[in-house]
């Protein structure tokens, strides 16, 4: 996503004469020699603030833009919180951007955004028209389920305007080719053509020339039918070739596994989510567990159907029992809670800074007071196991629990 952000920022940075840089942890806290826009991942930010003594300020830092706050995890939260703490005496302005959430007030308070500067919109409030439809299934997660989903997926493609690009999200890389085969088979039977989804105005010679450039010739059977794939397991040159063909309209359908929804760099007139369950191996090869897609993943997939150039369609295929939950939050906005005490991120940070300078209990409480967790503990204490809305008391309890869990460096606290 950082590369996508850089691509989007490049034209604007050139207009204002600013240098655009994708920063690593070593250079992030240094003062730039010229007007600079720095793009950094949450993990890199936290690394930069964890591997050395925290600076009291960052010279020249005037604006921090936090994108995709709906994806706020413990690493993202702690990194931004520490950055807020060390810039509190500066005139640094924090701006947050997020998909629609059902209550953005605490997010705004966390970033010290004034109420007058807070803009909140419903998921339906967008300039671009987006049609959302859903279809439920009662077939268990299996090959039969995806064959059943191939029918409505094909019809959504077939009855859309000619040439409309299509993105299809499936649960795993292994499901990509079988889904493509099901779609091509449906296309051959229903449309009585051996060209699949290739537009009638595109010559076989042109497609053949592109197919000859594929390093993996097993992809030819799909690309020659207008279906491509995108995920890191595909050879980079083949991946870029298929992206290029997709952008030019030479192939119409791009199939993407769910884990790649964050990095797929294209949008489409039609986005289809074929299933919202995935299988994860637990505790060995013999134990498999079925999980549901997260709400943030689904929102990310839906966002690929929002285009500046025209209308979009979003088709959700899921199990019947999951539809109500997904529909509710797609309509009302995402719920937001802190994940900071559910993971080891906070413990790892304390251990890291302990190696560089003395840290006491109050220092940790001060750091926690700048977190989104502090806002939510005061607003929704029961979610975090507290009965009172006293922020200071609850944060002190969290630190005590943290010390007990860490044990080994507990003597560093007083």
Q: Where would I find each of the regions flagged by the language model?
A:
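Inter-Walker segment of RecA-like/P-loop motor cores
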Residues: 10-54, 120-125, 132-135, 212
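Loop/turn-to-beta-strand initiation segments
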Residues: 33-38, 43, 60-63, 89-95, ...
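Conserved interdomain linker/interface between the two RecA-like ATPase lobes of SF2 helicase motors
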Residues: 27-30, 46, 92-187, 223, ...
């Amino acid at each position: 996503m950082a590369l996508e952000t850089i691509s989007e920022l490049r034209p604007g940075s050139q207009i204002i004469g600013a240098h655009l840089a994708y920063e690593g942890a070593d250079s992030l806290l240094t003062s730039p020699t010229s007007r600079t826009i720095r793009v950094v991942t949450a993990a890199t930010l936290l690394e930069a603030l964890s591997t050395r003594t925290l600076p009291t300020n960052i010279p020249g830092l005037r604006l921090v833009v936090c994108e995709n706050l709906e994806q706020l995890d413990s690493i993202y939260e702690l990194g931004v919180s520490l950055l807020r703490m060390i810039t509190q005496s500066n005139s640094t302005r924090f701006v947050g951007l997020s998909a629609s959430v059902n209550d953005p007030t605490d997010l705004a308070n966390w970033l010290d955004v004034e109420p007058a500067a807070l803009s909140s919109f419903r998921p339906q409030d967008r300039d671009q028209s987006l049609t959302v439809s859903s279809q439920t299934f009662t077939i268990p997660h299996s090959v039969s389920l995806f064959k059943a989903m191939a029918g409505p997926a094909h019809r959504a493609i077939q009855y859309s305007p000619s040439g409309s690009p299509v993105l299809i999200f499936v649960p795993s890389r292994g499901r990509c080719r079988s889904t493509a085969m099901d779609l091509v088979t449906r296309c051959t039977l229903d449309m009585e053509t051996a060209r699949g989804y290739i537009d009638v105005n595109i010559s076989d010679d042109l497609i053949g020339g592109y197919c000859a450039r594929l390093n993996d010739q097993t992809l030819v059977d799909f690309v020659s039918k207008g279906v491509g794939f995108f995920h890191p397991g595909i050879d980079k040159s083949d991946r870029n070739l298929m992206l290029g063909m997709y952008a030019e309209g030479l192939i119409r359908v791009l199939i993407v596994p769910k884990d790649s929804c964050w990095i797929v760099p294209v949008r489409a007139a039609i986005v289809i989510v074929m299933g919202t369950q995935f299988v994860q191996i637990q505790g060995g090869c013999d134990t498999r567990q079925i999980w549901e897609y997260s709400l943030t993943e689904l929102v990310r997939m839906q966002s690929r159907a929002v285009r500046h150039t025209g209308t979009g369609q979003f088709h959700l295929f899921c199990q019947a029992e999951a539809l109500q939950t997904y529909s509710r939050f797609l309509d009302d906005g995402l719920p937001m809670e802190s994940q900071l005490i559910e993971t080891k991120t906070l413990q790892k940070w304390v251990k890291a800074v302990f190696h560089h300078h003395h840290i006491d209990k109050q220092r940790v409480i001060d750091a926690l007071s700048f977190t989104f967790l502090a806002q939510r503990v005061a607003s929704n204490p029961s979610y975090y196991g507290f009965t009172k809305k006293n922020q200071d008391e609850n944060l002190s309890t969290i630190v005590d629990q943290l010390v007990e869990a860490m044990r080994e460096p507990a003597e560093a606290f007083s």
